């Protein structure tokens, strides 16, 4: 066991010297100087994985740090994607911006605790789970209006859809009069027979 200023700031020892008959003693006072030591740091994830659609403000992890000299600690985050998260003065790591699994399925952030002199770091590994999102859909008419004698098979409009999870898109039509039109697997809407 080494010296620890936080445990004892000094030691008073008695040094004895003996020749077998006579003993001489002298007091030794050993002073221990304080050295600013790095804080200790640990963190706990709130869950093993987080859905990409979790609300901003959700607590992702909680950090716990202590300083041997009882100095005030400040927390910070760094690393790719750290702009999506924030850490407060209590060590709570929260989500501050929306996540997208298709952009990043995980984040490895560096959590730091500093006493102003020394800094300790820890890694927070955050796993993101996919949520099946609705496809995006756009359409454009081939013309602003069509004559009542427009030929069967004439393209009326074109639809375009894409799915964030790259799933197969299926088109369909509904509503009053939809039986007068057909849509194929490419999104071409034509006049039906």
Name what the model sees in each region:
Residues 45, 141-142:
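Type III/flagellar secretion export determinants
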Residues 1-38, 48-58, 63-136, 144-153, ...:
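Acidic, turn/loop-rich segments in luminal/extracellular domains of secretory-pathway
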């Amino acid at each position: 066991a080494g010296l620890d200023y936080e445990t004892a700031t000094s030691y008073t020892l008695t040094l004895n010297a003996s020749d077998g008959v006579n003993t001489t003693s002298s007091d030794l006072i050993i002073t221990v100087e304080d050295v600013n030591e790095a804080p200790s740091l640990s963190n706990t994830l709130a869950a093993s994985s987080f859905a990409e659609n979790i609300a901003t403000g959700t607590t992702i992890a909680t950090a716990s740090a202590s300083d041997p000299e009882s100095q005030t600690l400040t927390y910070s985050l760094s690393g790719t994607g750290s702009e999506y998260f924030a850490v407060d003065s209590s060590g709570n790591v929260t989500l501050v911006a929306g996540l997208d699994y298709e952009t990043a399925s995980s984040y490895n952030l560096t959590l730091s605790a500093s006493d102003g002199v020394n800094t300790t770091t820890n890694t927070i590994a955050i796993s993101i789970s996919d949520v099946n999102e609705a496809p995006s859909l756009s359409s454009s008419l081939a013309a602003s209006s069509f004559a009542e004698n427009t030929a069967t098979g004439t393209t009326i409009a074109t639809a375009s859809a894409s799915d964030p999870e790259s799933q197969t898109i299926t088109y369909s039509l509904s509503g009053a009069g939809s039986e007068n039109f057909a849509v194929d697997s490419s999104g071409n809407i034509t006049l039906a027979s």
